[in-house]
């Protein structure tokens, strides 16, 4: 786990509306949902498909104000072979990806869980979002691998400083498969719950 970077954000501007529900709920096997939290959370992986969306789903059910993002140039999903991924633009909706893969090979993408994942995703928000295009303020940014952490920190450091609002960036290494994404999402949720009952993020030590 990598942590402790203190970056800065621009004021809120030109941000897409939150697609996920902020309604409190109970995830499978989870404890009772906590009240809505003022902590503004972002979860970031490479393609905004598996790890960040699983965490987005669980955190939103627990009442957190959460958004999820990818940092890649394009969205990549597994294809029929390791060297033949399905590549999409970030403007492509989850529903469009779902229908494209359904047409290409329903059996393959049902068996490997990609269609199920996309079906979940489109219930949370319309399309993947790229972190570098978002100018919203966050108290806590959680990344799902070290490379993504580095990309987030690099982007934050490249932005013009307009406020003194600190943001805490923590990396939680999560393997990019469905099982590890679920386990990682509960770990991220536990971490957010700990931070939300600690002193305000703006006053935490770097």
Stretches found by the model and what they are:
Residues 2-206:
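Short polar/charged helix/loop
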